[in-house]
């Protein structure tokens, strides 16, 4: 009886040990090629290049809830900016400009070990996208500066009577995507992960909000985009 209890206890310990989910954190870079015509058609915006147009900064956290499946959250962010010395509005005023496009993924990932160090994975991911445009203007002309800025995208008058020296306009949208990945384990906890796939986004330039008021923002074609990512990850058992 004692030996049977010992065997059952050993089996329980092994089962619990192997069934514990794994938590992993990753950092990396993404690459894609959007069509941001709303920025390209206006010369005051920074000239497009690989850093401000194609490169995405990536971080993510994944939770292994089954022996061959993970869920998590991952973000890819594009950043652009221009200081007031080089950013002059049509009303001859200057401002500090910054722009972010962030794609928040909520991935469901399945995987299998092809070899001890090599993993093949497939990811499906709902997307919550957000873009933010910020202007840091000089009081007391911040309202005029914002009006001048928005005329680059639309002739519609905004219904605002005041603005802060630093303010921003925001747009949110939803989308989906999928990716096929290859992972190489350097150790049992550290690995490189290379993925490629596509994403579709339902962005609408007419659905921007500035201090609660709906405004028109830049035209961006970010649907049907191929996307690549390379990241390094560390797993916590």
Label the model's feature ranges.
Residues 41-49, 89-97, 162-168, 213-220:
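Extracellular loop and loop/strand-boundary signature of outer-membrane beta-barrel proteins
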Residues 4-15:
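Sec-dependent N-terminal signal peptides
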Residues 1-5, 20:
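Positively charged n-region of N-terminal signal peptides that target proteins for export
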Residues 60-156, 184-189, 223-237:
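Gram-negative (and chloroplast) outer-membrane scaffold detector with strong preference
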Residues 21-23, 51-57, 95-104, 118, ...:
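Residues that define the transmembrane beta-barrel architecture of outer-membrane proteins
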Residues 19-74, 233-237:
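Short glycine/proline- and aromatic-enriched beta-strand/turn motifs that initiate or cap beta-hairpins
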Residues 173, 178-237:
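Predominantly the C-terminal beta-signal and adjacent terminal strand-loop region
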């Amino acid at each position: 009886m004692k030996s049977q209890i010992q065997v059952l206890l050993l089996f329980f310990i092994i089962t619990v040990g192997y069934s514990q989910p794994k938590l992993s954190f990753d950092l990396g870079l993404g690459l894609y090629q959007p069509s941001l015509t709303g920025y390209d058609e206006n010369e005051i915006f920074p000239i497009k290049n690989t850093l401000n147009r194609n490169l995405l900064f990536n971080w993510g956290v994944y939770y292994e809830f089954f022996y061959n499946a993970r869920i998590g959250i991952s973000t890819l962010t594009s950043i652009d900016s221009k200081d007031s010395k080089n950013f002059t509005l049509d009303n001859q005023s200057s401002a500090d400009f910054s722009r972010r496009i962030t794609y928040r993924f909520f991935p469901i990932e399945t995987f299998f070990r092809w070899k001890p160090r090599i993993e093949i994975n497939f990811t499906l991911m709902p997307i919550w996208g957000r873009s933010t445009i910020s202007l840091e203007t000089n009081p007391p002309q911040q309202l005029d500066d914002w009006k001048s800025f928005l005329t680059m995208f639309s002739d519609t008058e905004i219904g605002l009577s005041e603005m802060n020296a630093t303010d921003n306009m925001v747009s949110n949208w939803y989308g989906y995507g999928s990716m096929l990945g290859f992972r190489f384990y350097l150790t049992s906890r550290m690995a490189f992960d290379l993925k490629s796939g596509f994403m579709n986004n339902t962005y609408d330039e007419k659905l921007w909000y500035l201090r609660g008021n709906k405004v028109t923002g830049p035209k961006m074609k970010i649907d049907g985009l191929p996307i690549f990512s390379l990241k390094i990850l560390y797993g916590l058992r």
